[in-house]
């Protein structure tokens, strides 16, 4: 799988831009704050339907303009696809998004999933091991949603029910019968989320362990462990019943705190290397090796589930890795289309790949 071409209009700091890409490596060079990451963001947007940097589509429209357009042409093993996303300004604080896939209107973002497979690796991802649990949950949600529309739908329904329950908990004179409506929904969708996360993290751990062993020369053993907020049961129905009972048991606490304390929105994952929890006791080098292993495992898992090689976006991450980790990353990525942003041309990268295109970006313009 690879992206052949992109067109931008009024996207971030770009007026109009049209680029044709290499199937192999695309180096995007430029000083800081010139628009390199904006270009990766545009590519990512057409794959996932949303930005990896902001939850506000309005931020994607160039200042003083009323609309932004991103269009890509992508080639898969058996067919080609086009995705066009238009964002229109509605007043000062809101916007409207329109998506077309192969010239047909898309009404739900989930309809884009599995169309263009993509993995983003940025300096922020290197902090995932030591960051707060919310960042690790977002990582799991983002990657699992991309290969499992069922997970995306279950998670979306869970979040909607959670928001409604939490909103109601902030009111006075709560009615147990109304809370029960949300408890039923949270139990159902929460059980689905937990079971899908469990299987995904197990497989992710297996791939990560193999990669981590290769990076460290078999000196370290990595385990990624799922830490659910509730006990995991044998069957989906048992899990649903258990979450429902736990929600009932926590009602007094939740009503006092005006927040839901039970469910997968409080899950976490741990990174254990040689029986040591890297979240609290890992060195920066160990934490970065875990993060790199995790990202490369994503690519392997996507390949297993879809039989496609995902596109990899490397956003100013090469300079954050030492020479050995850079070498391992480059050697592993021979079958993937790469987009690499950097401030300086790395001769090592240039020498490693046969087909490479270099783009120089200055203030949203190709030079």
Functional labels for PLM-detected ranges:
Residues 127-217, 227:
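An accessory alpha-helical subdomain
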Residues 72, 337-344:
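Structural recognition of the conserved hydrophobic beta-strand(s) that form the central parallel beta-sheet
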Residues 36:
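Conserved lysine of the Walker
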Residues 45-57, 297-305:
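Post-Walker A helix-loop "phosphate-sensing" segment adjacent to the P-loop in P-loop NTPases
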Residues 48-127, 133-135, 144-147, 151, ...:
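Nucleotide-state sensing region of NTPase/ATPase domains
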Residues 315-317:
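Walker B catalytic acidic pair
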Residues 1-31, 178-188, 192-311, 320, ...:
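Conserved NTPase motor "head" modules and their coupling/switch loops across ABC/AAA+ ATPases, GTPases
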């Amino acid at each position: 799988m690879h992206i052949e071409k992109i067109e931008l209009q009024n996207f971030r700091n770009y007026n109009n831009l049209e680029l044709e890409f290499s199937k192999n490596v695309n180096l995007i060079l430029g000083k800081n704050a010139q628009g390199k990451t904006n270009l990766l963001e545009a590519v990512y947007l057409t794959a996932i339907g949303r930005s990896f940097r902001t939850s506000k589509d309005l931020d994607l429209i160039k200042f003083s303009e009323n609309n932004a357009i991103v269009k890509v042409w992508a080639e898969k093993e058996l067919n080609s696809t086009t995705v066009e996303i238009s964002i229109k300004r509605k007043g000062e604080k809101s916007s409207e998004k329109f998506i077309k896939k192969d010239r047909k209107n898309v009404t739900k973002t989930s309809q884009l999933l599995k169309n263009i497979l993509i993995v983003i690796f940025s300096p922020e991802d290197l902090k995932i091991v030591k960051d707060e649990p919310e960042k690790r949950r977002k990582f799991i949600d983002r990657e699992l949603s991309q290969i499992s529309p069922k997970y995306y739908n279950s998670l979306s329904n869970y979040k909607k029910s959670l928001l409604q329950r939490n909103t109601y908990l902030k009111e006075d004179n709560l009615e147990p019968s109304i809370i029960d409506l949300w408890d039923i929904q949270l139990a159902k969708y929460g059980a689905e989320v937990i079971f899908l996360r469990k299987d995904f993290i197990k497989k992710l751990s297996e791939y990560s362990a193999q990669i981590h062993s290769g990076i460290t020369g078999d000196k370290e053993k990595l385990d990624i462990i799922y830490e659910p907020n509730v006990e995991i049961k044998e069957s989906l129905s048992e899990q649903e019943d258990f979450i429902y009972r736990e929600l009932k048991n926590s009602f007094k606490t939740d009503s006092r705190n005006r927040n839901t304390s039970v469910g997968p929105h409080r899950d976490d994952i741990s990174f254990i290397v040689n029986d040591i929890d890297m979240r609290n006791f890992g060195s920066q080098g160990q934490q970065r090796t875990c993060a790199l292993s995790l990202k490369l495992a994503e690519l392997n898992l996507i390949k297993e589930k879809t039989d496609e090689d995902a596109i990899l976006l490397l956003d100013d991450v090469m300079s954050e890795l030492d020479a050995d980790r850079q070498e391992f990353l480059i050697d592993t990525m021979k079958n993937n289309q790469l987009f690499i942003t950097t401030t300086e041309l790395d001769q090592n990268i240039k020498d490693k790949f046969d087909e490479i295109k270099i783009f120089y970006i200055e203030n949203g313009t190709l030079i």
